[in-house]
């Protein structure tokens, strides 16, 4: 299990859908620990171009063009993340990082000077 992997979760808590895809947003040391939950962001089929959304699609293993919704973070039991869908590329992980910064109102990362 790695940060940036997408999993289909059956009957997510508080969600009317029978299944929803989530991407793991937690840092890798937490994922590798004995802690039972990880922070995940849900994936929805609608993309509105918000700075808290990341567009994803067939390249990430999904059937349709969709969007990671960083405003809807949830803590999910690792044991529920069993139906692997795909994973984000390095560039998509960077987009996820940027969207999480906006969603959590964190200061922007400083650019490295050359």
Range-by-range predicted roles:
Residues 1-114:
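Conserved functional hotspots at enzyme active or ligand-binding sites that engage polyanionic ligands
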């Amino acid at each position: 299990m790695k940060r940036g992997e997408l999993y289909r979760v059956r009957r997510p808590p508080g969600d009317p859908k029978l299944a929803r895809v989530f991407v793991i947003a937690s840092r890798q040391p937490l994922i590798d620990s004995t802690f039972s939950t990880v922070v995940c962001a849900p994936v929805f089929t609608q993309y509105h171009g918000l700075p808290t959304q990341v567009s994803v699609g067939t390249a990430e293993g999904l059937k349709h063009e969709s969007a990671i919704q960083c405003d809807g973070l949830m803590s999910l039991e690792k044991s529920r993340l069993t139906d692997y869908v795909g994973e984000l590329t390095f560039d998509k992980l960077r987009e996820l990082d940027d969207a999480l910064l906006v969603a959590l109102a964190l200061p922007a990362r400083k650019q490295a000077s050359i």
